[in-house]
Protein backbone atom coordinates (compact mmCIF):
# COMPACT_ATOMS: atom_id res chain seq x y z
CA UNK A 1 0.00 0.00 0.00
CA UNK A 2 2.98 2.31 -0.37
CA UNK A 3 2.40 5.47 -2.32
CA UNK A 4 4.63 7.19 -4.84
CA UNK A 5 5.28 10.69 -3.63
CA UNK A 6 7.36 13.58 -4.88
CA UNK A 7 9.27 15.51 -2.23
CA UNK A 8 8.31 19.18 -2.35
CA UNK A 9 10.56 22.09 -1.48
CA UNK A 10 9.96 24.45 1.44
CA UNK A 11 8.63 27.93 0.79
CA UNK A 12 11.44 30.50 0.47
CA UNK A 13 11.90 32.57 3.61
CA UNK A 14 14.06 35.43 4.78
CA UNK A 15 17.28 34.42 6.47
CA UNK A 16 18.67 35.91 9.63
CA UNK A 17 21.69 34.94 11.67
CA UNK A 18 21.04 32.69 14.63
CA UNK A 19 23.61 31.79 17.30
CA UNK A 20 25.79 28.79 16.54
CA UNK A 21 26.05 26.05 19.15
CA UNK A 22 29.71 26.03 20.31
CA UNK A 23 29.54 22.33 21.19
CA UNK A 24 27.65 21.05 18.17
CA UNK A 25 29.06 17.72 16.95
CA UNK A 26 31.90 17.90 19.46
CA UNK A 27 30.66 17.09 22.96
CA UNK A 28 27.58 15.36 24.37
CA UNK A 29 24.83 17.57 25.75
CA UNK A 30 24.57 17.24 29.52
CA UNK A 31 22.23 18.95 31.94
CA UNK A 32 24.35 21.43 33.89
CA UNK A 33 24.09 24.74 35.68
CA UNK A 34 22.84 27.44 33.33
CA UNK A 35 21.21 25.05 30.86
CA UNK A 36 17.43 25.19 30.98
CA UNK A 37 15.28 22.08 30.64
CA UNK A 38 12.38 22.21 28.20
CA UNK A 39 9.11 20.32 28.45
CA UNK A 40 7.72 20.05 24.93
CA UNK A 41 4.35 18.74 23.85
CA UNK A 42 4.49 17.25 20.37
CA UNK A 43 1.15 16.77 18.59
CA UNK A 44 0.81 14.97 15.25
CA UNK A 45 -1.67 17.32 13.61
CA UNK A 46 -4.79 15.94 12.00
CA UNK A 47 -4.76 12.55 13.71
CA UNK A 48 -8.04 11.50 15.38
CA UNK A 49 -7.71 10.59 18.15
CA UNK A 50 -4.51 12.57 18.58
CA UNK A 51 -1.08 10.96 18.50
CA UNK A 52 1.14 12.96 20.85
CA UNK A 53 4.23 12.91 23.06
CA UNK A 54 5.54 14.99 25.95
CA UNK A 55 9.33 15.30 25.94
CA UNK A 56 11.97 16.65 28.28
CA UNK A 57 15.07 17.95 26.50
CA UNK A 58 17.90 20.38 27.31
CA UNK A 59 17.42 23.87 25.95
CA UNK A 60 20.94 23.98 24.52
CA UNK A 61 20.24 21.08 22.14
CA UNK A 62 20.39 21.88 18.45
CA UNK A 63 17.53 21.08 16.09
CA UNK A 64 19.49 18.34 14.35
CA UNK A 65 19.62 16.43 17.60
CA UNK A 66 15.97 17.23 18.30
CA UNK A 67 15.12 15.67 14.93
CA UNK A 68 16.71 12.41 16.10
CA UNK A 69 14.78 12.56 19.38
CA UNK A 70 11.50 13.14 17.54
CA UNK A 71 12.08 10.23 15.18
CA UNK A 72 12.62 7.84 18.10
CA UNK A 73 9.94 9.24 20.40
CA UNK A 74 7.24 9.35 17.72
CA UNK A 75 8.13 6.06 16.04
CA UNK A 76 9.18 7.13 12.54
CA UNK A 77 11.80 5.40 10.39
CA UNK A 78 13.88 8.45 9.34
CA UNK A 79 13.41 7.47 5.69
CA UNK A 80 12.20 10.85 4.38
CA UNK A 81 13.21 14.50 4.37
CA UNK A 82 12.19 16.83 7.17
CA UNK A 83 12.25 20.47 8.18
CA UNK A 84 11.60 22.72 11.17
CA UNK A 85 9.56 25.90 10.75
CA UNK A 86 9.33 28.73 13.30
CA UNK A 87 8.59 32.38 12.65
CA UNK A 88 9.77 32.99 9.09
CA UNK A 89 12.62 30.48 9.39
CA UNK A 90 13.12 27.05 7.80
CA UNK A 91 15.77 24.67 9.16
CA UNK A 92 16.81 21.29 7.85
CA UNK A 93 19.66 18.82 7.45
CA UNK A 94 22.19 20.31 5.00
CA UNK A 95 22.73 16.88 3.43
CA UNK A 96 19.08 16.87 2.31
CA UNK A 97 19.85 19.25 -0.55
CA UNK A 98 17.08 21.69 0.36
CA UNK A 99 19.61 24.53 0.52
CA UNK A 100 20.50 23.95 -3.13
CA UNK A 101 17.15 25.36 -4.25
CA UNK A 102 16.60 27.64 -1.29
CA UNK A 103 19.77 29.17 0.22
CA UNK A 104 17.71 30.71 3.02
CA UNK A 105 17.23 27.28 4.62
CA UNK A 106 19.24 27.17 7.85
CA UNK A 107 21.48 24.32 8.94
CA UNK A 108 19.55 22.64 11.77
CA UNK A 109 22.76 21.64 13.55
CA UNK A 110 23.56 25.34 14.03
CA UNK A 111 20.18 26.38 15.42
CA UNK A 112 19.65 25.99 19.17
CA UNK A 113 16.27 25.04 20.62
CA UNK A 114 16.28 27.86 23.18
CA UNK A 115 17.01 30.39 20.41
CA UNK A 116 14.31 29.06 18.09
CA UNK A 117 11.55 28.94 20.71
CA UNK A 118 12.86 30.80 23.78
CA UNK A 119 9.63 31.30 25.73
CA UNK A 120 6.90 29.27 27.36
CA UNK A 121 3.98 28.73 24.95
CA UNK A 122 6.20 29.32 21.91
CA UNK A 123 5.50 26.96 19.01
CA UNK A 124 7.28 25.47 16.03
CA UNK A 125 6.39 22.93 13.36
CA UNK A 126 8.37 19.81 12.52
CA UNK A 127 7.38 18.43 9.12
CA UNK A 128 8.41 14.89 8.22
CA UNK A 129 7.99 13.41 4.73
CA UNK A 130 7.04 16.17 2.28
CA UNK A 131 4.84 13.74 0.36
CA UNK A 132 2.70 12.48 3.24
CA UNK A 133 3.33 15.81 5.01
CA UNK A 134 3.26 14.77 8.66
CA UNK A 135 3.14 18.05 10.59
CA UNK A 136 4.05 17.98 14.27
CA UNK A 137 3.12 20.98 16.37
CA UNK A 138 5.77 21.48 19.06
CA UNK A 139 4.67 23.60 22.03
CA UNK A 140 6.87 24.79 24.91
CA UNK A 141 4.87 23.80 27.99
CA UNK A 142 7.50 24.54 30.64
CA UNK A 143 11.04 25.85 30.94
CA UNK A 144 12.73 24.58 34.08
CA UNK A 145 16.02 25.29 35.80
CA UNK A 146 18.64 22.66 35.12
CA UNK A 147 19.27 19.86 37.58
CA UNK A 148 23.09 19.50 37.78
CA UNK A 149 22.64 15.85 38.74
CA UNK A 150 20.50 15.03 35.69
CA UNK A 151 21.96 12.31 33.53
CA UNK A 152 19.33 11.87 30.80
CA UNK A 153 19.54 14.27 27.90
CA UNK A 154 16.16 13.29 26.44
CA UNK A 155 13.17 11.74 28.16
CA UNK A 156 9.64 10.95 27.08
CA UNK A 157 7.33 11.86 29.95
CA UNK A 158 3.98 10.88 28.49
CA UNK A 159 2.10 10.34 25.27
CA UNK A 160 -0.66 8.46 23.54
CA UNK A 161 -1.09 6.06 20.64
CA UNK A 162 1.21 4.52 18.11
CA UNK A 163 2.83 6.45 15.32
CA UNK A 164 1.27 5.91 11.89
CA UNK A 165 3.41 3.78 9.56
CA UNK A 166 5.63 5.52 7.04
CA UNK A 167 4.29 5.78 3.49
CA UNK A 168 0.64 5.24 4.39
CA UNK A 169 -0.62 8.34 2.57
CA UNK A 170 -0.54 10.95 5.31
CA UNK A 171 -3.46 11.79 7.58
CA UNK A 172 -6.18 10.79 5.06
CA UNK A 173 -4.48 7.51 4.19
CA UNK A 174 -3.97 6.61 7.83
CA UNK A 175 -7.59 7.42 8.66
CA UNK A 176 -8.70 5.08 5.87
CA UNK A 177 -6.46 2.33 7.23
CA UNK A 178 -7.91 2.66 10.71
CA UNK A 179 -11.41 2.27 9.31
CA UNK A 180 -10.42 -0.77 7.25
CA UNK A 181 -8.84 -2.70 10.12
CA UNK A 182 -11.94 -2.19 12.26
CA UNK A 183 -13.89 -4.50 9.96
CA UNK A 184 -12.56 -7.98 9.11
CA UNK A 185 -15.21 -8.15 6.39
CA UNK A 186 -13.79 -5.16 4.55
CA UNK A 187 -12.45 -6.23 1.11
CA UNK A 188 -9.07 -4.63 1.88
CA UNK A 189 -8.81 -5.92 5.44
CA UNK A 190 -6.40 -8.79 4.75
CA UNK A 191 -4.06 -6.80 2.50
CA UNK A 192 -4.03 -3.86 4.90
CA UNK A 193 -3.36 -6.08 7.89
CA UNK A 194 -0.55 -7.81 6.02
CA UNK A 195 1.02 -4.47 5.11
CA UNK A 196 0.73 -3.11 8.66
CA UNK A 197 1.94 -6.30 10.32
CA UNK A 198 0.12 -8.43 12.85
CA UNK A 199 1.61 -6.58 15.83
CA UNK A 200 0.46 -3.10 14.80
CA UNK A 201 -2.04 -1.64 17.26
CA UNK A 202 -2.94 2.05 16.84
CA UNK A 203 -3.58 2.39 20.58
CA UNK A 204 -0.16 1.12 21.66
CA UNK A 205 2.13 3.55 23.47
CA UNK A 206 5.19 1.97 25.10
CA UNK A 207 6.83 4.63 27.27
CA UNK A 208 9.45 2.23 28.63
CA UNK A 209 10.61 1.18 25.17
CA UNK A 210 10.73 4.76 23.91
CA UNK A 211 12.95 5.85 26.78
CA UNK A 212 15.19 2.82 26.38
CA UNK A 213 15.74 3.86 22.78
CA UNK A 214 16.19 7.54 23.64
CA UNK A 215 19.03 6.63 25.97
CA UNK A 216 20.98 5.52 22.91
CA UNK A 217 20.98 9.07 21.57
CA UNK A 218 23.88 10.38 23.63
CA UNK A 219 24.97 12.73 20.86
CA UNK A 220 28.73 12.43 20.72
CA UNK A 221 30.21 13.25 17.31
CA UNK A 222 27.69 11.54 15.05
CA UNK A 223 23.98 12.00 15.72
CA UNK A 224 23.04 10.25 12.47
CA UNK A 225 24.86 7.01 13.27
CA UNK A 226 23.35 6.84 16.75
CA UNK A 227 19.88 7.53 15.36
CA UNK A 228 20.36 4.75 12.82
CA UNK A 229 21.40 2.36 15.58
CA UNK A 230 18.48 3.33 17.82
CA UNK A 231 15.98 2.80 15.02
CA UNK A 232 17.49 -0.55 14.01
CA UNK A 233 17.34 -1.81 17.58
CA UNK A 234 13.98 -0.25 18.44
CA UNK A 235 12.10 -3.55 18.59
CA UNK A 236 14.70 -4.96 20.97
CA UNK A 237 15.15 -1.95 23.25
CA UNK A 238 14.96 -2.94 26.89
CA UNK A 239 15.40 -1.21 30.21
Show where each model-derived region lies:
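Short linear regulatory motifs enriched in tryptophan with gly/pro/ser
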Residues: 1-239
